[in-house]
Amino acid sequence: GVLYVDDKGNYWIEEYILESPTHILNGFIWALWGVYDAWKLLENSEAKDLFHKCCKTLETNLKKYDNKYWSLYELSNTYLPMISSPFYHNLHIVQLKIMWALTSSNCFLEFSTKWEEYGLNRVNRVKAILNKSLFKILYY
């Protein structure tokens, strides 16, 4: 991953180097766990500081990944948002539960619970799959 600090002071770990960062959610969280491991295993204070800054970024911006019926895969600047596939939606839920276990931040628990409820709704699942398919047709 690559560290990117935006104009609002948010610390993002990007999965891909792009001119316009996309903030891929699962990649950010995977990389964040690497920072957490460096902090805990190496007792690295810089890693600890980066972990906390990135957690604050995630807490502040997590609502942007919620489209009111499913999770978004990323925050790209496309007209049509990139909906997560069912696999990645479920991965986001698991990742946020782990983030809650690591940090005790209720924000992570709240979104994991909300997204779990989204996934149990058949209409939401169908809508997400249709939107994901349309996204792929238009952008790939």
Show where each model-derived region lies:
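Long, well-ordered core segments of solenoidal/helical folds
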Residues: 1-6, 45-70, 110-127
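A generic structural signal for solvent-exposed, polar alpha-helical segments
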Residues: 18, 36, 76-79, 106, ...
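Well-ordered alpha-helical segments within folded domains of soluble proteins
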Residues: 23-39, 84-101
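Carbohydrate-binding/catalytic loop surfaces
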Residues: 4-26, 67-91, 130-140
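Short amphipathic alpha-helical interaction segments
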Residues: 46, 50, 80-91, 104-107
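C-terminal appended segment following the main domain
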Residues: 90-140
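Eukaryote-skewed repeat-based solenoidal scaffolds used as protein-protein interaction platforms
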Residues: 1-59
